[in-house]
Regions:
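Predominantly a Rossmann-like dinucleotide-binding segment in NAD(P)-dependent oxidoreductases
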Residues: 126-164
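Structural detector of well-ordered beta-strand residues that form the stable sheet scaffold
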Residues: 55, 94, 121, 150-151
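Glycine-rich, N-terminal phosphate-binding loop of Rossmann-like dinucleotide-binding domains
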Residues: 73-74, 154
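Beta-strand-loop-alpha-helix segment that lines the small-molecule cofactor/substrate pocket
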Residues: 64-65, 69, 75-128, 142
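N-terminal Rossmann-like dinucleotide-binding module
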Residues: 1-49
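Conserved SAM-binding strand-loop segment of SAM-dependent methyltransferases
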Residues: 51-58
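Nucleotide donor/acceptor-binding cores
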Residues: 2-4, 118, 148
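Short, Asp-centered acidic motifs that coordinate Mg2+ and/or phosphate
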Residues: 31, 68-69, 149
Length: 164
């Protein structure tokens, strides 16, 4: 089985995706990028894998030879622009947070997916957290009665992923 060669943008939250790729039999990390040089240096020491190339410049990273896809684990406000750049560079994209800040960004992102034919995946995971799972269980058990309309709201503290 040929492995999908990933690049990861962001060594902070991207660390979990790096670990996943290390254990998946069909994936491998070939490049990691972060403008935070100290974090990048620590990740390089931690992984101690000479097959991985490390970058501080995103444009250079997006041109890494042989890379198939990128995981975006950078600031939330940067996901759509980076996703668009990556797909225009021939790469598939996985965004681990909501990518678009405006409708215009969303339109441009969709148009880029359509024009490049690349896969764009948004990795929303809150639906697998305990609270939504419990609500689904209660509904399926009939403990909420007949549902005619429901609306929910979730507010996540995103201070850590929004630039200061």
């Amino acid at each position: 089985m040929e492995k999908v060669k990933f690049g990861v943008l962001g060594v902070g939250r991207g660390s979990s995706m790096i670990k996943f790729c290390e254990t998946a039999e069909n994936a491998e990390v070939v490049a990691i990028c972060d403008k935070w040089e100290e974090g990048l240096r620590r990740k390089k020491e931690e992984l101690n894998d000479e097959r991985i190339t490390y970058y501080t410049e995103a444009d250079e990273f997006l041109r890494h030879p042989g890379m198939d896809a990128v995981v975006l684990a950078n600031y939330a406000t940067e996901h759509a622009p980076f996703a668009i750049r990556a797909m225009k560079n021939g790469l598939h994209v996985f965004s681990e947070v909501l990518p678009c800040q405006t409708l215009a960004e969303a339109v441009e992102l969709v148009e880029t997916v359509e024009s490049t034919g690349k896969i764009y995946a948004y990795g929303e995971n809150y639906c697998f957290m305990p609270a939504p799972k419990e609500m689904r269980k209660l509904y399926r058990e009939g403990r909420l009665g007949e549902l005619e309309y429901a609306e929910g709201e979730y507010v996540h503290n995103c201070e850590s992923i929004w630039p200061q």
